[in-house]
Amino acid sequence: MSRGTNQKFKFTYLMQVMLEKTDDEHSLTLNQILEELEKYDVTAERKSIYADFQDMTDKFGIEIIKEQIGRETYYHVGSRDFELAEVKLLIDAIQSSKFITERKSRELIKKVKSFVSEYQANQIQRQVYVHGRIKTMNESI
């Protein structure tokens, strides 16, 4: 198999794909994972992916769950640092806080949403309105 130009970043891209594209409800097959890596111009062998999954668990604490459904094997990230409910709580607190500007709120929420998969991030796209609450204009926080 020919090597892609970003081959040295294979592990990083694989970890990014697994964290962004998978969760308890969304899994990927090995072929889908390889297709996602090809978007980054990275090629990989099946066995190297398995070894990388083991390294993710051993060295970074990112548990990759393997599920057999019919004839297909699916993979997804197990537990994360923050549960979806905790991320929602943080976002609600940011949005309802009067001392954080709207711009800073958007920036913080974008960062907090990176703790969950893109599917879960889409679920928490919501606005909290506190009647009579005025956001500060002070950008120095």
Protein language model annotation of sequence segments:
Residues 1-92:
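Short, basic/aromatic recognition patches that contact phosphate-bearing ligands
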Residues 81-141:
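Bulky hydrophobic/aromatic content
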